Amino acid sequence: MKNYLFTSESVSEGHPDKMADQISDGILDAILAQDPKGRVACETLLTTGLVVVAGEITTSAKVNFSEVARDVVKRIGYDHSDKGFDYKTCGVMIAVGQQSPDIAVGVKETLSDNQGAGDQGLMFGYAVNETPELMPLSIAMSHKLVKDLAALRKANKVDWLRPDAKSQVTVQYENGIAKRIDAVVISTQHADSVSNSTIQEFITEELIKKSIPGNWIDSKTKFFINPTGRFVTGGPMGDAGLTGRKIIVDTYGGHGAHGGGAFSGKDPSKVDRSAAYASRHIAKNIVGAGLAERCLVQVAYAIGVAEPVSITVNDYGTSKVGPEVLEKAVRQVFDLRPARITKDLDLLRPIYSPTAAYGHFGRNEESFTWERLNKVDQLKDAVKTLA
């Protein structure tokens, strides 16, 4: 398919599912700050006036889960019931147990980096040369819109913006290359007092036209701003929120593939998270090295076993050397045992809260170690010897 439209979406930090992700990762970070060896599988549910934190956590850290949850809600901006939630008055229920001893046996640390994977599963990493961050344009722009919208809200540019919001961007491809943005959808929660026309003008002029580079938008680009008309009831009052329910927003916006495992609330012994980060690291370095224009990497694990059961590279026909050579180069350059991933990407740190909103990939912050192009030369050298 050469000529087509492709759409991705993102959601703001005030979306109830993203609130849940941020609370789960806030708790993970609080534990890792005290106990880097803590085992965390933390799930969060939000509904009207209530936060429920559940899961399996084994740690020596002393963390006030309720306090962490309230701090996250406060930082997002839910500080009054008329916004759909209030960190001061919401209930917080804690239902946390310890990690199963059967799982713990499989992931115990050894001196030889042969710590077993925390579960079976398959993980994907993807990269494409459409943006400087080597991410698909549709998801990169979707994230930028809701992130910039939150910045406008927190800067008090207007007094009627509320935390809950969604974005959606449709990109037109010609001969497989992104050419223009065909449509932009923005739905933002707002105060009841503001008119639809005021919302539409502000979002068009202060958000869309300032956030998206002008070369992507033309006179035919369609803008849909709060297309239902009103969006007053939002946050957990409008919809329940749950950790791990925005896995496509978290990754590549529907491009590439997804193995099904969520990220937030999981320590790096869970390959759902660490191996997905490693797969992105591989794919980004392949594309960054100019070895392919587009790349998808799959890895898979058996619980309690360190070495992946499979590694697969798909170059979509954009590589001169082919996927088999790329796969051999990956095996030479990258150690995909979970303990090595954790060490190589320095994952036993409280670095996860920023990942829980606006995407885990395509970010420039220093703590996003899986975004570094630090294996480019090694991959090039490996390909030379193999081709």
Curated annotation (Swiss-Prot):
K(+) binds at E43. InterPro entries: ADOMET_SYNTHASE_CS (IPR022631), S-AdoMet_synt_C (IPR022630), S-AdoMet_synt_central (IPR022629), S-AdoMet_synt_N (IPR022628), S-AdoMet_synthetase (IPR002133), S-AdoMet_synthetase_sfam (IPR022636). One of its GO terms (biological process) is one-carbon metabolic process. Pathway: Amino-acid biosynthesis; S-adenosyl-L-methionine biosynthesis; S-adenosyl-L-methionine from L-methionine: step 1/1. Mg(2+) binds at D17. It is found in: Cytoplasm. It catalyses: L-methionine + ATP + H2O = S-adenosyl-L-methionine + phosphate + diphosphate. L-methionine binds at E56, Q99, D239, K270. One of its GO terms (molecular function) is magnesium ion binding. Its cofactor is Mg(2+); K(+). ATP binds at H15, D164, A165, K166, R230, F231, D239, R245, K246, A262, K266. Residues 99-109 are annotated as: Flexible loop. GO terms for cellular component: cytoplasm. Gene3D superfamilies: 3.30.300.10. It is an enzyme of class 2 (transferase). Binds 2 divalent ions per subunit. Binds 1 potassium ion per subunit. Its EC number is 2.5.1.6. Keywords: ATP-binding, Cytoplasm, Magnesium, Metal-binding, Nucleotide-binding, One-carbon metabolism, Potassium, Transferase. Homotetramer; dimer of dimers. Belongs to the AdoMet synthase family. NCBIfam families: metK (TIGR01034). Catalyzes the formation of S-adenosylmethionine (AdoMet) from methionine and ATP. The overall synthetic reaction is composed of two sequential steps, AdoMet formation and the subsequent tripolyphosphate hydrolysis which occurs prior to release of AdoMet from the enzyme. This is S-adenosylmethionine synthase. It comes from Bdellovibrio bacteriovorus (strain ATCC 15356 / DSM 50701 / NCIMB 9529 / HD100). The gene is metK.
